[in-house]
Amino acid sequence: MASGVAVSDGVIKVFNDMKVRKSSTPEEVKKRKKAVLFCLSEDKKNIILEEGKEILVGDVGQTVDDPYTTFVKMLPDKDCRYALYDATYETKESKKEDLVFIFWAPENAPLKSKMIYASSKDAIKKKLTGIKHELQANCYEEVKDRCTLAEKLGGSAVISLEGKPL
């Protein structure tokens, strides 16, 4: 079921900026987004970038010690969100980076919010082409342990996430 909610151009631009890893100056790399949250506009007609809810690559190691833990803390406990997380992980063979689409629908969110977000998920996923990994979570227990994300990225082959061993 489609909800009629549109995806704003800003969301698509952020996604394309995160997806394309072109050679950049160190200053440009620091400004790349590591994680972002998307929410519904106040009139519930558009999916937009949530202001102030992002982690920049340049923040990691400076103001952000563990980007994954910081990201989990950004998720609201009483409302739904969509998120993009640029995961850096290691398998037994190599180091990898992949974008993960996350649908956050906590149990404490209002039913109407859960319904709108659930029915709009396909609209945003169609615009974010090339996403290999998706995670849906309904409580902090499901996301606070980095093993849940590692499982989505490659299961037992993943040995570390964000430089932290599993």
Curated annotation (Swiss-Prot):
Positions carrying Phosphothreonine: 25, 63
Span(s) of short sequence motif Nuclear localization signal: 30-34
Keyword tags: Acetylation, Actin-binding, Cell membrane, Cell projection, Cytoplasm, Cytoskeleton, Isopeptide bond, Membrane, Nucleus, Phosphoprotein, Ubl conjugation
Family: Belongs to the actin-binding proteins ADF family.
Positions bearing Phosphotyrosine: 68, 82, 140
Principal localisation: nucleus
Location of N-acetylalanine modifications: 2
Chain positions found as N6-acetyllysine: 13, 73, 144
InterPro entries: ADF-H, ADF-H/Gelsolin-like_dom_sf, ADF/Cofilin
Example of a GO cellular component annotation carried by this entry: synaptic membrane
Cross-link (Glycyl lysine isopeptide (Lys-Gly) (interchain with G-Cter in SUMO2)) at residue(s): 132
Organism ancestry: Eukaryota, Metazoa, Chordata, Craniata, Vertebrata
CDD domains, per database record: ADF_cofilin_like (cd11286)
Tissue: Widely distributed in various tissues. Not found in skeletal muscle.
Full protein name: Cofilin-1
Subunit relationships: Can bind G- and F-actin in a 1:1 ratio of cofilin to actin. It is a major component of intranuclear and cytoplasmic actin rods. Interacts with the subcortical maternal complex (SCMC) via interaction with TLE6 and NLRP5. Interacts with C9orf72.
Cellular compartments annotated: Nucleus matrix; Cytoplasm, Cytoskeleton; Cell projection, Ruffle membrane; Cell projection, Lamellipodium membrane
Organism name: Mus musculus (Mouse)
SUPFAM superfamilies on file: Actin depolymerizing proteins
